[in-house]
């Protein structure tokens, strides 16, 4: 079981690396900064199944992804965590802290790595990106492009295509009155005018 996970992790790293590097336009090759966020960590294990903890998988994939991305010219990578910790042990501020860290490094995009839990029959890959609200609209278009590239690479590995998705938050509006994004990491990155994807 663990050796198959290693194979999957290696494939994911190469797929994500190819997707992100494909988005570095020649004019931007002088420098693009990608923030990688290994989901969960510390006291928050995330999903747990078959002796595996999401926080461990997200960290392993993220560290390998960092190494892969740094092999491309013009790509700088920053991490929200590099060990089994959380940027903030306070649950209510943890996601905000992750976005703040990426924004402080002037990241062009924040990629939050997760492995969802679900029924044993659930499988495949999906990518969440900013909705089509007018607020900082460029994060939507860049997020859609990045999500499509990531999803194409992941499904190319043979993972079932669960699609690229957006989700509205019916209880939150952006400052311009447009509908907010549901996921905090995407919403808060957008408020920093930074593309966030999960």
Residue ranges and their predicted role:
Residues 10-22:
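Bacterial N-terminal signal peptides
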Residues 1-12:
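Bacterial N-terminal signal peptides that target proteins for export
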Residues 142-167:
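Acidic, glycine-rich loop-and-strand cores that form catalytic or ligand-binding grooves
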Residues 29-146:
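Catalytic-core regions of hydrolytic enzymes
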Residues 69-73, 153-157, 188-194:
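A structural motif corresponding to the C-terminal end of an alpha-helix
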Residues 19-32:
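Sec-dependent signal peptide cleavage junction
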Residues 105, 112-119, 163-198:
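Active-site-adjacent mobile loop/cap segments within catalytic or ligand-binding domains
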